[in-house]
UniProtKB/Swiss-Prot annotation:
This is D-aminoacyl-tRNA deacylase. It catalyses: glycyl-tRNA(Ala) + H2O = tRNA(Ala) + glycine + H(+); a D-aminoacyl-tRNA + H2O = a tRNA + a D-alpha-amino acid + H(+). The keyword Nucleus does not apply. The keyword Cytoplasm applies. It is found in: Cytoplasm. Belongs to the DTD family. Keywords: Cytoplasm, Hydrolase, RNA-binding, tRNA-binding. A Gly-cisPro motif from one monomer fits into the active site of the other monomer to allow specific chiral rejection of L-amino acids. It comes from Vibrio atlanticus (strain LGP32). InterPro entries: Daa-tRNA_deacyls_DTD (IPR003732), DTD-like_sf (IPR023509). One of its GO terms (molecular function) is Gly-tRNA(Ala) deacylase activity.
Length: 144
């Protein structure tokens, strides 16, 4: 399971022109679910995402996590993250989880985030338009 996290000052996701999720300061989490992923991996990844120190302290060092700055999380499913891009000019998607499994684990991950801090989410498998202001920019790839 993969989370591409971005520290944002604002982010929103729209489906058919309607805002379905929106946050101010916090983390935009693009979540990719791979074959073999399960609830235990989703919970471990949620714990890493919500405790990963990406926000500046009083000395402007990245020592604070999203909970410590009272930020929010916006979780967006991203089936392209597990893609195989090592060869050729077209990605291979065989490493991604089956859509039903991916949706279940996406919802589980989002619910776990929601249990510890304010969480918004995109709409699984929808054609989404994601807008964000990346603060820094600060972007990390987390994988379990």
């Amino acid at each position: 399971m993969i989370a591409l996290i971005q520290r944002v000052s604002e982010a929103a996701v729209r489906v058919d022109g309607e805002v379905v999720g929106e946050i101010e300061q916090g983390l935009l989490v693009l979540l990719g679910v791979e074959k073999g992923d399960d609830e235990a991996k989703a919970k471990r990844l949620m714990e890493r995402v919500t405790t990963y120190r990406v926000f500046g302290d009083e000395d402007d060092k990245m020592n604070l996590n999203v909970k410590q700055v009272e930020g929010k999380v916006l979780v967006v499913s991203q089936f392209t993250l597990p893609a195989d891009t090592k060869k050729g000019t077209r990605a291979g998607f065989s490493r991604g989880a089956h859509p039903e499994d991916a949706e279940r684990l996406y919802n589980y991950f989002s619910d776990q985030c929601e249990s510890v801090l304010p969480t918004e989410r995109g709409r699984f498998a929808a054609d989404m338009k994601v807008s964000l202001v990346n603060d820094g920019p600060v972007t990390f790839w987390l994988q379990v």
